[in-house]
Curated annotation (Swiss-Prot):
Keywords: Flavonoid biosynthesis, NADP, Oxidoreductase. This is Dihydroflavonol 4-reductase. Bifunctional enzyme involved in flavonoid metabolism. It is an enzyme of class 1 (oxidoreductase). GO terms for molecular function: dihydrokaempferol 4-reductase activity; flavanone 4-reductase activity. The keyword Oxidoreductase applies. PANTHER family: NAD DEPENDENT EPIMERASE/DEHYDRATASE, STEROL-4-ALPHA-CARBOXYLATE 3-DEHYDROGENASE, DECARBOXYLATING. Belongs to the NAD(P)-dependent epimerase/dehydratase family. Dihydroflavonol-4-reductase subfamily. SUPFAM superfamilies: NAD(P)-binding Rossmann-fold domains. InterPro entries: Epimerase_deHydtase (IPR001509), NAD(P)-bd_dom_sf (IPR036291), NAD(P)_dehydrat-like (IPR050425). The lineage of its organism: Eukaryota, Viridiplantae, Streptophyta, Embryophyta, Tracheophyta. Pathway: Pigment biosynthesis; anthocyanin biosynthesis. It comes from Petunia hybrida (Petunia). NADP(+) binds at residues 54, 173. The keyword NADP applies.
Amino acid sequence: MASEAVHAPSPPVAVPTVCVTGAAGFIGSWLVMRLLERGYNVHATVRDPENKKKVKHLLELPKADTNLTLWKADLTVEGSFDEAIQGCQGVFHVATPMDFESKDPENEVIKPTVRGMLSIIESCAKANTVKRLVFTSSAGTLDVQEQQKLFYDQTSWSDLDFIYAKKMTGWMYFASKILAEKAAMEEAKKKNIDFISIIPPLVVGPFITPTFPPSLITALSLITGNEAHYCIIKQGQYVHLDDLCEAHIFLYEHPKADGRFICSSHHAIIYDVAKMVREKWPEYYVPTEFKGIDKDLPVVSFSSKKLTDMGFQFKYTLEDMYKGAIDTCRQKQLLPFSTRSAEDNGHNREAIAISAQNYASGKENAPVANHTEMLSNVEV
């Protein structure tokens, strides 16, 4: 009688481990959630893991108790990412300093961003396990130029000389992202680390962070009456937060991914977005006229062809983006359910402007004269 073959048990499949910087922020936290759902072990870096108020939304994620660890790290501290990156196969670098009111932008924003990027690459090299680094870049690396174009792709670069000469709002952020991305491309090549940069436009959608995300201050300015942000969306490009995070993972996992990728699914001028919001959410007063903005503006498009040609598919519409953002803001009491009075009857009236400060504090019904709260030391 032939003896029955006995098979040794299969060795356990190693669970991949990745590091996410800026994990407590708008993009970082959603990316962590999606990675955990896929079974990744995630090393999430934050500035202060002991600040329960700022990390609670991460600790409450499904699988967080088994697959998530928090690590203290700071872009301004050399080598502070070493421990978090040790043992990781991949790194998603989402964190970035954003202080638009800095008195010394060169030393407080630009240099820390570039040094932080290079420090992370050095940490990857020390770990000797990291095969791929995915960097969340910015549309500010593409289209900040004196002569605006109607079409941009991954070969486009903003004009640094123009940025330094004009010093427009947020100029130090644009400059820091450009310099960091270019420096990273060179350094990663020297260290034999695959480097991918993902360039998102305005990111809109639901969120799990406790406070109001900076990009939604811009996207929802049509509702809040924050006129200073209208110029940003007069010829806007958009992507849903979930599509963006799925693209991060898609490119990390795709063996042939390399270089820069734009991740933008929609483009529209401000009048078309305002019309959509008015029709879908009539309870909000949304302007029909925008002073100084031509109704016949052409759209400016960002091409995601390189990304979609690799097989990535966008899932969400522009309406989906706004619905996710508005629903979440309402649930978190960061946005009122209406900006019209009972006597308004749907006719145009002066908007109730709501400042970023009121959003963050939850004072959603406090009327404020057109007030712009600059972004300061936030995590994207």
